[in-house]
Amino acid sequence: MSSSPSRKNPRVLFVTSEVFPLCKTGGLGDVSAALPAALRELKADVRLLVPGYPSVLSGLKYKRKLAEFDLLPHFPPTTLFSSRLQINESVSLPLYVIHCPELYQRPGGIYLDDDGQDWPDNAQRFGLLSKMGALLASDASPLSWIPDIIHCNDWQSGLTPAYLHYHSGKKAASLMTLHNLAFQGCFPPDEVARLGLPPESFSVHGVEYYGNLSFLKAGIYYATRITTVSPTYAREIQHEPLGFGLQGLLAERSNAITGIINGIDNTVWNPATDPHIVKKYSSRNLAAKKINKLALQREMGLEENETIPLFAGISRLSYQKGYDILLQVAPMLADLPAQLVLLGKGDQSLEKQLVMLAQTNPARIAVRIDYDEALSHRINASADCFLMPSRFEPCGLNQMYSQRYGTPPIVHTTGGLIDTVTDLAPDTPAGESASGFHFHEMTADAFMNGIGRAIDAYYNTRLWKTLQHNGMRKDFSWRSSALAYLSIYSLLMQR
């Protein structure tokens, strides 16, 4: 919907299936709170639209009824509430909540039931989220506030641009952000009619994807513009294997795709103020890291030794995260000598093998099968080097956390890992802008070569401090990400 020429600040409806702290299963929940908050601090008028799960309704201090939709075609009776979500002391976000008891009021998870199975009516549940987003972003909205841009996130709101395409009146521009292309929201073709989409939409030039309806493909096909969560990932998804079958369409739309790195919360991830670590420090007193290192070695049952290089990993334990390769490397790493601390949970086979590995070498390897937020902070503050051998990584966060704490990462060259970690190349022995180490082939030998380069650098005190300082100086703030999104919003408002 075209904006007033006198109004420069965009009105944005941010549509998401999860937002921290009300409802979260992964990184999308964090992004959905942090990015809109950073945008509001830059004077964008951003409002959120979320489903009314039990945790959302119970987590709000108040809610005000805005509109009722008893006769919304193809969906159960629905009420739209407004509220506010307090993000920090200075920022709260206006929130629209879709209250539809038949679709959202139930025990279990956001996407899965108590048995870990997809809810059988997920097409309806997230079809309603998409439909309500499209309604509020058009001249059919019952509200006086109409957005210039509707910002959709992953498959759960992917039908929004499709609904807008088939709306004949005025409508907002749409932005589709792809956080993880592996999840595509595919459903049987009879859902097309049930969701109120016209029959002609079910074609290769529409929502059809290998004989099914794909919410994600719909968003990619119909959105005005597309963003991903890193520039490299934006290129990778236009080719196999990371296009997951959508690479042809994404390549066709390459001129509409922009990669923008996610940010991190610099107030939460700050070694100078972190309440979870033993000794606070900054780039001016990096020697304090050794105090944290000795404390972590003691906590994890490792030999206390401030000079031995301590490597660490914090991750979901999975094939995608490369932990099968790490399993091959860990015994070699312990023999160097070096130490290894791992924190995470996931694939049960990987969990068992890692625990057995730690039991065979308890002075050098420690494994905690869990996710512990406070411990993750202590690991970042204590380790000398962080390991991140992901096969693919749209953006990644831990490599940014580790650099913030003066802990150079070793990363596989994929996605956001390339964009956020500057390699110590062989021809730059002084360090220059380097902040970590890349390895290119997804093999134990290549990974071990990266670890070897890191150990050589670790024993060069001046070079190591350069790497630490370079990483700690990088700007991974959400403000930086928000400025990039504002540039995209500006393009959309000029269309």
Swiss-Prot record:
Keywords: Glycogen biosynthesis, Glycosyltransferase, Transferase. NCBIfam families: glgA, PRK00654.1-2. It comes from the Bacteria. Pathway: Glycan biosynthesis; glycogen biosynthesis. Signal peptide: none annotated. This is Glycogen synthase. One of its GO terms (biological process) is glycogen biosynthetic process. ADP-alpha-D-glucose binds at residue 24. PANTHER family: ALPHA AMYLASE DOMAIN-CONTAINING PROTEIN, GRANULE-BOUND STARCH SYNTHASE 1, CHLOROPLASTIC/AMYLOPLASTIC. Belongs to the glycosyltransferase 1 family. Bacterial/plant glycogen synthase subfamily. Gene3D superfamilies: Glycogen Phosphorylase B. GO terms for molecular function: alpha-1,4-glucan glucosyltransferase (ADP-glucose donor) activity; alpha-1,4-glucan glucosyltransferase (UDP-glucose donor) activity. It comes from Nitrosomonas europaea (strain ATCC 19718 / CIP 103999 / KCTC 2705 / NBRC 14298). InterPro entries: Glyco_trans_1 (IPR001296), GS/SS (IPR011835), Starch_synth_cat_dom (IPR013534). Synthesizes alpha-1,4-glucan chains using ADP-glucose.
